[in-house]
Regions:
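Histidine-rich, glycine-flanked metal-binding segment
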Residues: 1-4, 9-56
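Divalent metal-coordination and catalytic microenvironments
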Residues: 8, 28, 50, 61, ...
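Metal-associated gating/positioning segment near the N- to mid-region
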Residues: 48-113
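Active-site mouth loops of central-metabolism enzymes
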Residues: 60-73, 96, 122-135, 204-208
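Alpha-helix-loop-beta-strand connector modules within alpha/beta enzyme cores
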Residues: 103-120, 168-179, 332, 336
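Histidine/acidic residue-rich metal-binding segments in metalloenzymes
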Residues: 134-304
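His/Asp/Glu-enriched, well-ordered alpha-helical/loop segment
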Residues: 200-228, 294-298, 302-304, 309-384
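C-terminal cap of metal-dependent C-N hydrolases
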Residues: 319-322, 376-435
Length: 435
């Protein structure tokens, strides 16, 4: 079977392309892209007028909890959430149980993702054994099995000497070190941003300095080792300034930001104590959020990620101090970006596609996907005018801990193609995909 998308606005910054085109998919690849493509016998014709077609979206920071915490999420339910949100590829973080710190653990996730057959699962391997920050993990073995990058996400490597060692080692394999930047001796006990929120709510604060000092340290280690460095879930304006300066210097430094750090702040945490707003790193100031939006717009921050962090109801529906950090995000990321950045003219569709598809694919060392004949048909079609209200019932994820319940947003993925299979059809997940 082949698919013919008629009249889509095709946006691909790799080709300097932003035009209304027809796109024909045959088998696993794009067969033809032109102003007008005539349907062939047997083609499934999809009316894409008014919709945007982009290279498949990539989220390079998700937690699928599999293996070990399947009561929160599994590779299957996480894949369904990813497709529903418009993603063709995700990079899974290694804080599973057991920790993904060896080749067989990486291979398990890839194979399970292939069995589910919805998206490409691109596991990140741990930097250190057990993510304990003490011994180098089996980096080479994990590269051989398909690890996309390396991170001790959730903790960060506390020892500068150990971080230097892992960066020197990873630099041999054409992979990035994705750094969770947090000095735990400074952040210890913190549950909200140190400042207005901690004072107003009477809770222990988590200083921005604890993040910014480690960003600065890791940039210095990048300069020393030459290892490509990716800063995870940046949350402060000062952190963005450090990244901007590193890039100006010519260092191989990239960065990501989450929608919740772009569009929420500590001021949104009220005396209702909505634990879905408890994040790691925490929601910072409104000024930080605006600075991060500007950093996305000017390219300082390369990628939009979700840090998709599913938790069971009992882990969130409790006192703030003991509730778990994090929120789900795969199914709200695209509409949040369209609503708050594109529709407000802070970011073009070209910029959106660059941050949500092109840049993360490049950073993860994945094969480029371009909307041109001969390239793999990993594509996302979305309707930027479709309005959606976020409710618990909206989610395909096993967990419902969204920070945006009740929000009315614009822009939803309607169709997703992975290896030429239509795995999302008219906003409905298709198990195994239409071929």
């Amino acid at each position: 079977m082949a698919f013919l998308l008629k009249g889509a606005r095709v946006v691909d910054p790799q080709l300097n392309l932003d035009a209304v085109m027809d796109v024909r998919i045959e088998g696993e690849t794009i067969a033809e892209v032109a102003a007008t493509v005539a349907p062939q016998e047997g083609d499934t014709v999809i009316d894409a007028k008014g919709k945007v077609l982009a290279p498949g979206l990539v989220d390079m920071h998700v937690h699928f909890r599999d293996p070990g915490f399947e009561y929160k999420e599994t590779i299957e339910t996480g894949s369904r959430a990813a497709v529903h949100g418009g993603f063709t590829d995700v990079a899974t973080m290694p804080n599973t149980n057991p920790v993904t710190d060896n080749g067989p653990a990486v291979r398990f996730q890839i194979d399970r993702g292939n069995e589910v057959g919805l998206i490409h699962v691109r596991p990140m391997g741990a930097l250190t054994k057990g993510s304990k920050g003490q011994e180098l993990a089996e980096i080479g073995n994990m590269v051989d099995e398909g690890a996309s990058a390396f991170s001790d996400d959730g903790h960060g490597v506390q020892s500068a000497g150990m971080m230097r060692t892992v960066m020197e080692y990873v630099s041999q394999f054409d992979r990035v070190v994705a750094a969770h930047c947090e000095i735990e001796s400074i952040s210890a006990g913190g549950v909200v941003n140190e400042g207005r929120a901690s004072t107003r709510l009477g809770m222990f604060g988590w200083p921005a300095l604890g993040e910014e000092l480690e960003i600065s340290r890791d940039i210095d280690l990048c300069r020393l080792t030459g290892c490509p460095l990716h800063i995870c879930h940046i949350s402060t304006g000062r952190g963005a300034e450090l990244v901007r300066a590193a890039k100006k210097e010519g260092l191989p430094v990239t960065a990501e930001v989450c929608p919740h750090h772009l569009f929420l702040s500590e001021d949104d945490i009220t005396d209702t104590y909505n634990t879905n707003l408890k994040m790691n790193p925490p929601l910072r100031t409104a000024e930080d959020a605006l600075a991060l939006q500007a950093a996305v717009a000017d390219g300082t921050v390369d990628c939009i990620v979700t840090d998709h962090a599913p938790h069971a109801t009992h882990e969130k529906d409790c006192e703030w101090e003991i509730s778990y950090f994090g929120c789900i995000g795969l199914e709200t990321s695209l509409p949040l970006m369209i609503t708050n950045m594109v529709r407000t003219n802070k970011l073009s569709y070209t910029g959106l596609v660059r941050a949500m598809a092109v840049n993360p694919r490049r950073i993860l060392r994945l094969e480029p996907v371009k909307i041109a004949a001969g390239y793999k048909a990993d594509l996302t079609l979305f309707d930027p005018e479709k309005k959606v209200q976020i409710t618990p019932e909206y989610f395909e994820s096993k967990s419902k801990n969204s920070a945006f319940i009740g929000a009315e947003l614009y822009g939803v993925a309607t169709d997703v193609f992975v290896d030429g299979k239509r795995v999302l059809a008219n906003e409905v997940v298709v198990p195994g995909g239409e071929k």
